[in-house]
Regions:
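Bacterial N-terminal signal peptides
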Residues: 15-27
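Active-site catalytic motif of lipid deacylating hydrolases and related acyltransferases
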Residues: 35-94
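Gly/Ala-rich beta-loop-alpha elbow adjacent to hydrolase catalytic centers
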Residues: 100-105, 109
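Flexible "cap/lid" loop of the alpha/beta hydrolase fold
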Residues: 117-118, 122-164, 191-194
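Conserved loop-alpha-helix segment in the C-terminal half of the alpha/beta-hydrolase fold
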Residues: 215-242, 248
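Catalytic active-site module of serine/aspartate enzymes centered on a nucleophile-bearing elbow/loop
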Residues: 235-266
Length: 266
């Protein structure tokens, strides 16, 4: 074989190696850019008659997948204080975040989500009122089984709770009796007036939103959740057979939607 032919083959091999190396470098760069573009911080907001511990399954998945996760513990003593508690946690974030709310927490994130640190909102079987609206009135559009039951009780000083004997039926039908009983006995009483608090500036009007519909929700009518999503032009997913406690019973589906929001919100 002539020296010139050998040189051509060496040059061709070198060229191919360089092309492969450049292709790999480009792929790695794009992957790094996409990873960098993904929102890394997640803030979770629980709903009425619950506390932040219900997010444990979702928290574990998100942390394993590399997210920084914070959980708000609302006092439920007033809507304003719940919004303030949420904004307090938002102020601790080191960058953009996805703000997630369950149930009554949806109203809280709608009000608190105008914070500049919030890149997107995720509603998990949650209320999504507009300006001047409150969740109590919105609930009348599509009444829930819970709203027509005797399960909601009120204390002498105006705080509501769910009758522990009926908690599983209306809130957590897809959880074990033991887990539902613990949640019923550890529920945080919620000021009744919170459900009538009007939204001033709904964050979903200016930021991207996602809605998870729990198809067997008896606390919020699934049709109301669908209506909210359609009005807000939210990205919507439905979890078949899930109760209102979908964030506890179906953490994989909930975490997947949050991660989708983190990948697409800007």
């Amino acid at each position: 074989m002539s020296n010139s032919l050998k040189a051509m083959r060496v040059a061709r091999g070198t060229s191919q190696s360089l092309c492969i190396a450049l292709l790999l470098l480009t792929c790695c760069t794009l992957s790094a850019q996409n990873e960098h573009a993904r929102v890394r911080n997640i803030v979770l907001v629980h709903g009425a008659w619950a506390d932040g511990s219900g997010w444990k399954g979702v928290y574990d998945i998100l942390v394993k997948d590399g997210f920084n996760v914070s959980i708000v513990q609302e006092p439920e003593t007033s809507f304003q204080e719940d919004v303030a508690a949420t904004k307090r946690v938002l102020a601790l974030q080191d960058g953009q975040c996805i703000l997630v709310g369950h149930s009554y927490g949806g109203a809280v994130i709608t009000e608190a989500g105008t914070d500049p640190s919030v890149a997107g909102l995720v509603y998990i079987a949650a209320h999504m009122p507009d300006a001047g609206e409150n969740e109590a009135d919105d609930g009348k559009r599509f009444p829930s089984d819970l709203s027509q039951s005797t399960a909601i009780k009120k204390t002498a000083d105006g705080f509501t709770y769910l009758d522990p004997a009926q908690f599983r039926e209306y809130f957590a039908a897809d959880l074990s009796a033991e887990q539902a009983s613990f949640m019923a006995r550890s529920q945080v009483l919620n000021l009744a007036d919170n459900f009538k608090a009007a939204i001033t500036a709904p964050a979903w009007r200016t930021k991207p939103s996602w809605m998870l519909v729990a198809t067997k929700d008896r606390a919020i009518n699934p049709d109301l959740e669908r209506w909210y999503a359609e009005r807000a032009k939210s990205h919507k997913v439905e979890v078949s057979g899930a109760s209102h406690a979908v964030y506890v019973s179906r953490p994989k589906e909930v975490a997947a939607l949050i991660e989708e929001a983190a990948s697409h919100a800007r």
